[in-house]
Amino acid sequence: LERLLGGGWSGAVILLDYGKTLAQCLEGSPAGTARAYRSHQLSGAILENLGSQDLTCHVLWDRLEPILVAQGFRSVRLERQEAFFVKHAGSAMERIMTSGDNEGTGRLRALTHPAHFGAKFQGLSGIR
């Protein structure tokens, strides 16, 4: 991340993923957050079927936030994905919701509804 953010370029960085702080991981997931998915099915056997299943784990936001600050980003903020979209793309969301495009509306709901990705994913952002 330090290499990606280096070089003195100006602009915004937006990282969207699901994650926790280290304290949240230690308290709520002491065995870790690594999971495997094969054919859209959750598996606890993360070392089996290597190459034919997806591996995933939570991002540690409190390890990434200081990197943004050290690289000169300001207004560094961690928000739930739904709040991030409402704050930064509210008018675009409104256009989608009133467009009559059922597919687009469904995708937007999946990204922002708290029962779907809205509460599970977060956005870490900063500007320089």
Tell where the protein language model's regions lie, with residue ranges.
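Long, Lys/Arg- and hydrophobic-enriched amphipathic alpha-helices
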Residues: 1-128
